[in-house]
Amino acid sequence: MKAEEWLERAKKDLDDAKFNLEGGRFEVSAFLAHQAAEKALKALYVLKFGRLWKIHDLVQLAKQVGAPHEVVDVCDKLNPHYIATRYLVETVYTAERSREALELADKVIEWVEKQLQK
């Protein structure tokens, strides 16, 4: 897949995350927010390296594509949602927690979009 296709899928995942937040499916919403950020970063990775890196660690992806410290910090906050939403851990998902994940993912997508326009 091309970088643009990865970014388009990232945006769709973010839209789906918003839909699930509105429907009260907070865990699904936070998971999709993580997926949106991951796919956005993979768009940039594919553009830079010409191949896909099969990894779910947003911090590692962000560092590999040369993200600034602020974006790496955002990724660090999003990273736990990959595991916590899929396994029965003690994390309680609320509308506020899911909304925060959406906002963080949106920041990653915005940064990636700017990089792709350069």
Question: Where in the sequence are the language-model features?
Answer:
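Terminal alpha-helical segments
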Residues: 1-118
